Amino acid sequence: MGLSTHCQLVFSWKPMNTHMVSRAMEGSLKSYPFPSNINITSCVSIKLNDRNYLLYDEGRVRLSLLNLGERCDFVPFLSVELFKPLQSSGVYEKLHESNN
């Protein structure tokens, strides 16, 4: 039986820089500087383990989320990090060794 592992995909909003804050404060807050109606967790749900995380390598995850971000117009505010498992069954390592 293989060792079960999980990758953690973390979404967070980038902190706004002072230029963006000052632009938002001009006049009124009616034009909020980022889309407040978007909930990324309802758009993307990925649970990775040692059998499927080869399908969602870091580049593909980032690319698919950036594509989603472009459609929803929140790319400048999104930070995506993929944390690989600390332990694995060796499948990922063996595949990358054979590809190099």
Curated annotation (Swiss-Prot):
GO terms for cellular component: mitochondrion. It is found in: Mitochondrion. Keywords: Mitochondrion. The keyword Mitochondrion applies. A stretch of 270 kb of the mitochondrial genome is duplicated within the centromere of chromosome 2 resulting in the duplication of the gene. The expression of this duplicated gene (At2g07685) is not demonstrated. This is Uncharacterized mitochondrial protein AtMg00770. The lineage of its organism: Eukaryota, Viridiplantae, Streptophyta, Embryophyta, Tracheophyta.
